[in-house]
């Protein structure tokens, strides 16, 4: 059995004169890798490259040892890959079951009984077993995201590419989905781009931070979070001298400083704190606005 893997070597992608990715080198093995970065960092472009929806302008991409630029090998990758794009187009009038069944048929699940059983399985995984007969257009945004995730989970693929899978999903279901992804990641490569830094902290051992198309950080989540140790504290007023400061739900301000401070009472840093510190405080956290796209 070949171990699931993805490799990128000096990968770049341009759109006309605009550079979306430059010099990206990554090796991805089974497990969940979180992808963070500000708007326009190149995250969605990177996911589309991994999902074979877009070719690189330079460099080499290999998925499961196959070259997505070779048509026959690209077809082989797509048969073994689950992809949930940031935006999913649903055909008018389709129910959740009909849509996932349609995708399963496209993926060559030709035996009707086995296909229907698999559709029921993935709908159950995402908490939609009771809503299979509901028309997708009548669903909430979070339910639609779960339908999109269900089709990506068909066949427990060795590679799973997810762009904002938990957007609009309620907290209880997000916990359920984390459990599903953690189980799949025991044998599959899962790449997860999300606004929710708490999803990355809960699910991922590894995080990649993109900025302006380049990798700013690639390593353990715990190491990145540790970089903010001794640099985070709560105060009654914002501190203009720190890298980032925002008002929390309690009314106090959470301050993140570029250097350790010994004149304040520190609090345990979060991944969000460390992410802001890495970016020099140039973005605000989810509690006050978007961190990443």
Regions found by a protein language model. Give the residues of each.
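Conserved structural motif at the start of ABC-family nucleotide-binding domains
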Residues: 6, 21-23, 78
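Helix-to-loop junction immediately C-terminal to a conserved catalytic motif
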Residues: 51
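Conserved ABC transporter NBD signature motif
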Residues: 59-70, 76-77
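Conserved ABC ATPase "signature" region
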Residues: 101, 105, 113-131
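Conserved ABC ATPase signature
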Residues: 135-139
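Catalytic Walker B motif of ABC-type/P-loop ATPase nucleotide-binding domains
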Residues: 160-164, 169
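ABC transporter nucleotide-binding domain
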Residues: 175-256
């Amino acid at each position: 059995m070949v171990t699931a893997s993805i490799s990128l070597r000096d990968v770049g992608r341009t759109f006309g004169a605009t550079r979306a990715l430059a010099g990206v080198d990554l090796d991805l093995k089974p497990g969940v890798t979180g992808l963070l970065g500000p708007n326009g960092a190149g995250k969605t472009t990177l996911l589309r490259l991994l999902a074979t929806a877009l070719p690189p302008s330079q460099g080499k991409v290999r998925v499961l040892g196959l070259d997505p630029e070779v048509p026959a090998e690209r077809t082989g990758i797509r048969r073994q890959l689950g992809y949930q794009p940031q935006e999913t187009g649903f055909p008018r009038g389709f129910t959740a079951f009909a849509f996932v069944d349609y995708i399963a048929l496209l993926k060559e699940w030709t035996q009707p009984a086995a296909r229907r059983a698999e559709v029921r399985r993935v709908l159950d995984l995402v908490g939609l077993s009771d809503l299979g007969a509901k028309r997708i257009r009548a669903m909430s945004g979070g339910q639609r995201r779960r339908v999109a995730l269900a089709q990506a989970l068909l066949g427990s693929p060795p590679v799973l590419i997810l762009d904002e899978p938990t957007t609009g999903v309620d907290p209880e279901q997000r916990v359920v989905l984390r459990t599903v992804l953690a189980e799949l990641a025991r044998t599959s490569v899962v790449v997860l781009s999300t606004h929710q830094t708490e999803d990355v902290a809960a699910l991922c051992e590894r995080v990649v931070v993109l900025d302006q198309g380049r990798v700013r950080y690639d390593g353990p989540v715990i190491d990145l979070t540790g970089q903010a140790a001794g640099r985070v504290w709560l105060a009654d007023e914002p501190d203009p001298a720190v890298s980032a400061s925002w008002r929390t739900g309690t009314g106090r301000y959470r301050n993140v400083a570029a250097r350790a401070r010994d004149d304040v009472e520190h609090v345990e840093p979060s991944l969000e704190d460390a992410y802001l510190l890495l970016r020099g405080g140039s973005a605000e956290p989810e509690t006050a606005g978007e961190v990443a796209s």
